[in-house]
Amino acid sequence: MDGILHSEEFGTGGMPPLICLHGLLGSSRNWRSVAKDLASDFRVWALDLPNHGDSFHREDASVKAMAMDLLHWLDQQKLGSVTLCGHSLGGKVAMRFACDHPKRIHKLVIADIAPRDYPPEHHVPILEALLSLDLSGLNSRKEADEALASQVPNWAFRQFLLTNLTERDGCFHWKANLSALRASIDGLSSNPLQAEETFEGLTLFVRGGKSGYLRTEHLAQVGKHFPNSKVEVLPEAGHDLH
């Protein structure tokens, strides 16, 4: 273990606690509004995955390693059985964790991701665009935004990516460990589960009606790995359900 995951805690009631995991290049802040809404009924933790946000950096960025980090964090917090909710990459970590440690899962919620392989080509140009940015020459976040615009034309998505940019001692730095994520992107894009693996516990898959990440043709695979699952659709939502 390289360190303890950074977390944000909301609420004091409700057991078992709810643990929320973000997607690739996200952070715990992505769950803040949802966590605050649920805080009256649950004790909620939103975590930064390794190589993201304020959590530690290391070269092993595999889903398996992240699931082990989650186990260490739960043990450090003295939490037994939890409800685990993961979005996108966080959903893959949650699936892996549930299969590895089923007794630690009360209920499982997977947000807009399936237990399948995804083409890494979607993420590679994004990571390479961020890695190519010359941070030493930046004077403002606006300059970073302008420099990325040609490679990442969607303004809203650029603002999401730039949440990873932080200024310290007059210099800009990436909070995410981009080089480790780029080196691991093939593994991060693949199915986190082996063909024969199953999780028998109660599982909810939440799907964005306008997202292509969890489609009707993926549901057979969902049922194979998660036989006690159901799928709910948010018709007007895209991939970023929260």
Predicted regions and their residues:
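Catalytic histidine-centered segment of alpha/beta-hydrolase-like enzymes
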Residues: 234-242
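Serine-hydrolase catalytic-loop signature spanning alpha/beta hydrolases and amidase-signature enzymes
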Residues: 14, 23-33, 44
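Conserved serine/cysteine hydrolase catalytic core
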Residues: 169-225, 230-233
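Conserved alpha/beta-hydrolase catalytic His-Asp/Glu region
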Residues: 121, 136-191
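Flexible "cap/lid" loop of the alpha/beta hydrolase fold
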Residues: 95-100, 105-140
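Active-site glycine-rich loops that stabilize anionic/oxyanionic intermediates
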Residues: 23-26, 88, 209
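Active-site loop/oxyanion-hole signature of alpha/beta-hydrolase fold enzymes
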Residues: 3, 32-85, 89
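Alpha/beta-hydrolase fold catalytic core
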Residues: 1-19, 39-42, 75, 79-80, ...
